[in-house]
Amino acid sequence: KSAPKHEWIGKNSASWALCRCNNNWVVRHNSKEIPIEPAPHLRRVGILLDYDNGSIAFYDALNSIHLYTFDVALAQPVCPTFTVWNKCLTIITGLPIPDHLDCTEQLP
């Protein structure tokens, strides 16, 4: 919650990001970029927040491949933020979908 509201995600000490830049993937935190090698062809990204043990991990969710883990000291609530430039974004929590929701759209 302490991240500046008008600043790119990953450009400060209160946010972490996985970004695609020119067909390469990087993780960002506090204005530092670390390339993910080799550059994966990601179709689905998994994010695991372990608040109690202080880590945020990014995964290739389709292939169950770990991409990067940040060790973090969290003192405030964490708010997920997602940005997609020109494609579709679907958020899956890993929890079962309640029966009362109409979920007719199929994932590719």
UniProtKB/Swiss-Prot annotation:
Keyword annotations of the record: Cytoplasm, Cytoskeleton, Metal-binding, Microtubule, Transferase, Ubl conjugation pathway
B30.2/SPRY domain ranges (all copies): 1-100
Localization annotation: Cytoplasm; Cytoplasm, Cytoskeleton
Superkingdom of the organism of origin: Eukaryota
GO biological process: regulation of microtubule cytoskeleton organization
Entry function: Has E3 ubiquitin ligase activity towards IGBP1, promoting its monoubiquitination, which results in deprotection of the catalytic subunit of protein phosphatase PP2A, and its subsequent degradation by polyubiquitination.
Name by which UniProt lists this protein: E3 ubiquitin-protein ligase Midline-1
